[in-house]
A protein has these predicted regions:
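Catalytic cores of DNA base-excision repair glycosylases
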Residues: 6-7, 11-138
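Short, low-complexity, intrinsically disordered N-terminal peptides in bacterial proteins
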Residues: 1-4
């Protein structure tokens, strides 16, 4: 199995894409990327991510926006409940003082399931959660 792990790591080093959400430990930015990329290819989601985080650089700016503006920045991505859930979760987090720090708290955010909570906690906080999506399960 050690050989498999080495092969997998080498493949990743040779094939990884340089994406902004892979260069940060900021849980907010990782959360935004994970939600945008649900049911969306990276090639399409990339520009939306850039525009969205430029306008809403943190949970407080997203929480302060009105829903119509959030929906305007989401327009074209589809699955609009994702944008509504982001906005509702941002308002909840802003009221609580910021982004949650535990898996249980992240999982409790509106629109966040086990995969997204694991991704945020693993990538942002270095917690030992496996980030396993439906493709891996299949």
């Amino acid at each position: 199995m050690d050989n498999f792990g080495e092969i997998l790591i080498k493949w990743y080093q040779d094939n990884k894409r340089d994406l902004p959400w892979r260069r940060t430990k900021n849980p907010y930015l990782i959360w935004i990327s994970e939600i945008i990329l649900q049911q969306t290819r990276v090639a399409q989601g990339y520009d939306y991510y850039q525009r969205f985080v430029k306008r809403f650089p943190d949970v407080f700016s997203l929480a302060a926006a009105d829903e119509d503006e959030v929906m305007k920045y989401w327009q074209g991505l589809g699955y609009y409940s994702r944008a509504r859930n982001l906005h509702a979760a941002a308002r909840s987090m802003a009221g609580a003082g910021g982004f949650p720090k535990t898996y249980k708290e992240v999982l409790a955010l509106k629109g966040v399931g086990e995969y997204t909570a694991a991704a945020i906690c693993s990538f942002a906080y270095g917690m030992p959660y496996a980030v396993v999506d439906g493709n891996v399960y299949r």
